[in-house]
Design a protein with these regions (language model features):
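Secretory targeting signals
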Residues: 2-64, 68, 92-164, 203-224, ...
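Transmembrane helix boundary and interhelical loop/hinge segments in multi-pass membrane proteins
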Residues: 62-89, 96
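Junction motif at the cytosolic side of a transmembrane helix
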Residues: 224-244
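Short hydrophobic alpha-helical segments that form membrane-spanning helices or hydrophobic packing faces
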Residues: 1, 92, 172-176
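Transmembrane helix segments
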Residues: 10-17, 165-200
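Short loop-to-helix capping motifs
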Residues: 1, 86-88, 166-168
């Protein structure tokens, strides 16, 4: 993810000078590639690339969580684990905790890369960075928390799909297809519903709120999606026949 963050940052800063006005937001998640120099130069502008990275990070983490959860089924290790730890809730919860810790480290690294490359890239493009000093740490902390919460929820959705399908390929296909295709199609036919779908909600959270969905409602809806994913995963894992 850190490598993607660096590449996206380069694209954002090098293309900003050629953008006269911000492009209209596209339906569905993502769509923050085109930004203006003025947007980058404003307070908190050093985190501009993080909004675009978030969509890629969401797909990557959904895939990683899904593979970690589904690989035990494909290898047959799940039977050994369940026999060694009959309390399935504890078993799946432990896996979730380990994946959350990994996600925290990944989002720290990604955020740091975005911040570290922002100043050199801005200087190369002649973008003024004086305003970045205004509330630097509050902007950084807020962006990191929003990004991390969204990343964890994407991971939980990937884990949910893996538990239900028992297949990493199927789980990743469904998750990525929903995020990159289905939500965009819904955005074309029913644009008012887009902000409340998983991708639109998480994108609104990372953006600090939008005109259609404020930060607090986005946070609440994001946490709701996460809670639903955890609940369904635990119930399905607890009740499903694994040993036979």
């Amino acid at each position: 993810m850190a490598g993607f963050a660096a590449l996206v940052s380069v694209f954002i800063y090098t293309s900003a000078s050629a953008v006269a006005t911000p492009a209209a937001p596209q339906p569905g998640p993502g769509g923050r590639f085109a930004v203006t120099v003025a947007q980058i130069a404003e307070p908190g502008g050093f985190l501009t690339a993080l909004g675009t990275v978030s969509t890629l990070a969401g797909v990557i983490l959904l895939a990683l969580w899904a593979m970690c959860a589904a690989s035990d089924y494909s290898t047959g290790v799940i039977r050994i684990l369940v026999q060694a730890e009959p309390k399935r809730i504890r078993l799946l919860t432990g896996k979730m905790v380990a994946l959350v810790v990994f996600t925290l480290l990944a989002t720290v690294a990604t955020t740091l890369i975005v911040v570290l490359v922002s100043h050199p890239l801005a200087r190369l493009q002649g973008i003024e960075t004086q305003a970045w000093k205004t509330d630097f740490f509050p902007h950084l902390l807020s962006a990191y928390v929003n990004f991390t919460v969204a990343a964890i929820v994407w991971g939980l959705i990937g884990l949910l799909l893996a538990v239900l399908t028992r297949s990493s390929a199927l789980a990743i296909g469904i998750g990525a297809g929903w995020l990159l295709v289905v939500e965009n199609l819904i955005g074309i036919t029913a644009p008012d519903a887009t902000p409340y779908l998983p991708g639109g909600t998480l994108n609104a959270l990372i953006s600090g709120g939008t005109s259609k969905l404020g930060w607090l409602p986005a946070l609440g809806l994001t946490l709701l999606y996460g809670a639903v994913a955890v609940s369904i995963s635990l119930v399905a894992f607890h009740r499903r026949d694994i040993l036979s």
